[in-house]
From Swiss-Prot:
Keywords attached to this entry: Amidation, Cleavage on pair of basic residues, Hormone, Secreted, Signal, Sulfation
InterPro entries per the UniProt record, alphabetical: CCK-like, Gastrin/CCK, Gastrin/cholecystokinin_CS
Signal peptide boundaries: 1-20
PTM (free text): The precursor is cleaved by proteases to produce a number of active cholecystokinins.
Chain positions found as Phenylalanine amide: 103
Modified sites of kind Sulfotyrosine: 97, 111, 113
Gene designation per UniProt: Cck
Subunit structure of this chain's protein: Binds to CCK-A receptors in the pancreas and CCK-B receptors in the brain.
Propeptide part(s) removed at maturation, as residue ranges: 21-45, 47-63, 107-115
Gene Ontology MF: a single term: peptide hormone receptor binding
Protein name: Cholecystokinin
Function: This peptide hormone induces gall bladder contraction and the release of pancreatic enzymes in the gut. Its function in the brain is not clear. Binding to CCK-A receptors stimulates amylase release from the pancreas, binding to CCK-B receptors stimulates gastric acid secretion.
Length: 115
C-alpha cells in the first residue's frame, strides 16, 4: 500500500516537472519571425498564470491524502479494534479468523469421517 502511494506521488512530481519545463525552439529563427511567434506565447502565458492556483490546490490535496494514509489503521491493531466492537455472542470471536475464510478446514478437523 505504501509502495503504491509512493509510486503515485513520484509519478505526480515527474508529471508536474515535465509540464513545467519551457518549450525550447529547435531551430534559430529570424528576429522578426521570433517576435511574431512570441506575441501569442505571451498571451498564452498570461492566460496560464492563474492556472498555477489549481496546481497549488493539487499539492495541498496530495499532502492531505498522505496525512490520512499515515493516520489510517493498519496491521494487527486494526484487527484487534474490530474484534472489540463485535458482540460477545458472535460466532467468529477468534482474532485469527478476522479477515480470512477457512472454507471448512476446522470443521473437517473436528469431525472424524468414516473411511
Amino acid at each position: 500500500m505504501k509502495c503504491g502511494v509512493c509510486l503515485c506521488v513520484v509519478m505526480a512530481v515527474l508529471a508536474a516537472g515535465a509540464l513545467a519545463q519551457p518549450v525550447v525552439p529547435v531551430e534559430a529563427v529570424d528576429p522578426m519571425e521570433q517576435r511574431a511567434e512570441e506575441a501569442p506565447r505571451r498571451q498564452l502565458r498570461a492566460v496560464l498564470r492563474p492556472d498555477s492556483e489549481p496546481r497549488a490546490r493539487l499539492g495541498a490535496l496530495l499532502a492531505r491524502y498522505i496525512q490520512q494514509v499515515r493516520k489510517a489503521p493498519s496491521g494487527r491493531m486494526s484487527v484487534l479494534k474490530n474484534l472489540q466492537g463485535l458482540d460477545p455472542s458472535h460466532r467468529i470471536s477468534d482474532r485469527d479468523y478476522m479477515g480470512w475464510m477457512d472454507f471448512g478446514r476446522r470443521s473437517a478437523e473436528d469431525y472424524e469421517y468414516p473411511s
